[in-house]
Amino acid sequence: MRIVPPSVFVCVLFVAGTAAADVLQVFSERQGMSGQFIQHIVTPEGELLETSEGQFSLLRPHFVRWQIESPDQQLLIVNENTLTQIDWDLEVVSTRAMTPENRSALDWLMAPARELEQTFDISSSSRQATLIPREQISAFERLEIEFEATSLRWELSLTDSAGQILTVTLTEDPDVMPTRSDFDPPPTDFE
């Protein structure tokens, strides 16, 4: 299994809404969401490296829960400025600060419109947005977001500097709105 930095998982998570407005505008108005995800990591040549799936929850301003259920069991939680990663298969818990230096695509998407416009070349419509950094940033070289309103499904495609592509399908459950307590790391029998 290829290990992908937790910041990559975190960086593609917090996007949802309705197709009535510009995708990034919809994003900026969104307070939270929960649902299921399927994630694929693909080489620049198109070879599938890994597929995983699980549950996610997102809550503004800085809360993310990314629970990988298959093929391994991992939990990534961003609670304000702290990232906690729990790997039940390896029985490991790690914690690190989320700082401006390791700013993820998620942080960029949550930025004010003026900051996005200064940092990225953006093309956007009611269904799709593409963000390309004007200068090198660590998280990605290209982020594409597409929304399927009828199925409440979001397709995210993040291309890194090596040309590797992380695609994530988020299927929103409109009946489940996360609460602040969903982002407290659970206790474990290991540290």
Question: What does each model-found stretch correspond to?
Answer:
Residues 1-9:
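Bacterial N-terminal signal peptides that target proteins for export
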Residues 15-18:
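N-terminal signal peptide c-region/cleavage motif recognized by signal peptidases
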Residues 22-43, 47-49, 86-141:
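Flexible, processing/modification-adjacent segments and terminal tails
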Residues 30-32, 51-53, 61, 71, ...:
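Extracytoplasmic
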Residues 33-39, 52-56, 64-66, 156:
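One face of beta-strands
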Residues 39-43, 60-62, 70-72, 133-135, ...:
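Short, well-ordered turn and helix-capping elements at secondary-structure junctions
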Residues 55-105, 166-167:
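An acidic-aromatic
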Residues 94, 117-118, 123-191:
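Gly/Pro-enriched, hydrophobic low-complexity segments
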